[in-house]
A protein has these predicted regions:
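Short proline/glycine- and polar residue-rich coil/turn motifs
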Residues: 63-69, 130
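Surface-exposed loops/turns
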Residues: 36, 67, 79-80
């Protein structure tokens, strides 16, 4: 005979396992200031200067449906170490960042380390130390 307490313990265990806080326990990026729900949020993770901004050489790529406000991006390949994160809001869903005069982005974009370059972006200025279990917050600029 199974006691009632057994089911309560299983229920509590499942709540803990599937709670949003638990989802943030691994490498996680919180994309803030998403202006609207159109398109996708594209995230590229780079681990060194040589591959930085070479999309086909990014260490990890995540593309997730945009949601107004905040989007949680879980990382599956990396959970700690030195990385640079590049994020853009692909508003029209074409897979490319729209740029204007002097290649200035026309869609929401951001780099890790609150880096807002005035010229060509540099890995060492965008680089951060990703700590296991500590989410990284990045605010999009439009």
């Amino acid at each position: 005979m199974i006691r009632k307490g057994f089911f309560v313990r299983i229920f509590l265990f499942l709540i803990v396992i599937f709670s949003p806080v638990t989802l943030l326990a691994h490498g996680t990026i919180l994309i803030k200031n998403v202006e609207h729900s159109e398109g996708f949020i594209d995230v590229k993770i780079y681990t060194n200067e040589e591959t930085f901004l070479k999309e086909e050489l990014s260490y990890e790529t995540v593309r997730k449906k945009a949601m107004k406000g905040e989007v949680i991006i879980p990382l599956s390949k990396i959970h700690e170490g030195k990385i640079a994160i590049v994020v853009y809001h692909d508003e029209d869903g074409n897979g490319e960042l729209k740029t204007g005069l002097f290649w200035r982005p026309k869609e929401g974009f951001a780099f890790s380390n609150n880096y807002n370059p005035k010229g060509p972006p540099k890995f060492k200025k965008a680089a951060i130390m990703l700590e296991h279990g500590v989410p990284v917050a990045i605010e999009l600029n439009y």
